[in-house]
Design a protein with these regions (language model features):
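Two-component/phosphorelay signaling modules centered on CheY-like receiver
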Residues: 12-30
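Acidic, metal-coordinating helix/loop segments flanking the phosphotransfer/catalytic sites
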Residues: 31-49
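Acidic catalytic/metal-coordinating carboxylates
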Residues: 34, 60-63
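The feature encodes the CheY-like receiver
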Residues: 57, 86, 105
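Short amphipathic alpha-helix used as the core "switch/output" element in two-component signaling
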Residues: 62-75
Length: 120
């Protein structure tokens, strides 16, 4: 069975591009554009990896991870994406349980390599 990725990203363009890329790479994909939707999907579906934008319209992507961890539904791995490079933010992501933090724009080849590493 294919690993499942939950894309949590408020940009429809980015979400659609990632979804197409991941489906072509053989992954099952779910997507959400808000904290509320991502939390609901994460609680309802088995997710292996969450690709998590930190800035969402209704809060922080880290809120999603916290809610899923609290519900016992955290994915095997969470990969945070952000346009910010502050060391404090990176540490906050790691403290919340993220496996890694990638700075946007994320090179596709690097993203796929990191996903394969985290799911391997």
């Amino acid at each position: 069975m294919a690993a499942t990725i939950l894309i949590v990203e408020d940009s429809a363009l980015v979400t659609d591009a990632f979804a197409l890329l991941f489906i072509e790479a053989g992954y099952a994909v779910h997507s959400a554009r808000t904290v509320a939707d991502a939390t609901r999907i994460g609680k309802e579906k088995a997710v292996d990896l969450m690709l998590l934008d930190l800035t969402l319209p209704d809060g922080s992507g880290l809120d999603v991870l916290g809610a899923l961890r609290e519900a016992g539904r955290a994915p095997r791995a969470t990969l945070a994406m952000t346009g910010h490079t502050e060391p404090e933010l990176r540490q906050k992501c790691f403290d919340a349980g993220c496996a890694d933090v990638m700075v946007k724009p994320v090179p596709i080849r690097d993203l796929l390599r990191q996903i394969e590493r985290l799911l391997g």
